[in-house]
C-alpha cells in the first residue's frame, strides 16, 4: 500500500483496485466506503472523488457532508466551499451541507 501522512490520518491506497481511504491513529478505517481519491483536510473536511469523477466532502468522523455528489468542489475557506452541480449550477456550501448560493 502507498501511504501519505497528514494530520491525524494516514491516506492509504488499496492495491487490488487503487481505491483510497484514511486510517485513524488507532488503525481503524475512517469510512466504510473507498474512493478514487481523498484529499487532505481543510477546515475539518476532505474532498473525496468517486469512480464517476463526482466529488463530495468527508468529515473527520467519516461522514459525507451532502447526499448530493457534485461535478467539482474546492476546499473550504472561511467556512464555505465553492463547487458546481452536475446540472451546471455553481454554488457555495457551508459546513452543515446547506447550499447557500446557486447561480448558472
Across the structure, where does each feature detected by a protein language model lie?
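Residue-level detector of conserved, function-critical positions
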Residues: 1-104
Amino acid at each position: 500500500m502507498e501511504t501519505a501522512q497528514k494530520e491525524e490520518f494516514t491516506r492509504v491506497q488499496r492495491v487490488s483496485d487503487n481505491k483510497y481511504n484514511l486510517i485513524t491513529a488507532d488503525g481503524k478505517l475512517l469510512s466504510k466506503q473507498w474512493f478514487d481519491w481523498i484529499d487532505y483536510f481543510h477546515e475539518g473536511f476532505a474532498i473525496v472523488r468517486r469512480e464517476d469523477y463526482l466529488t463530495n466532502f468527508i468529515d473527520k468522523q467519516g461522514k459525507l457532508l451532502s447526499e448530493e455528489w457534485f461535478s467539482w468542489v474546492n476546499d473550504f475557506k472561511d467556512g464555505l466551499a465553492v463547487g458546481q452541480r452536475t446540472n451546471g449550477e455553481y454554488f457555495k456550501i457551508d459546513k452543515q451541507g446547506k447550499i447557500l448560493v446557486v447561480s448558472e
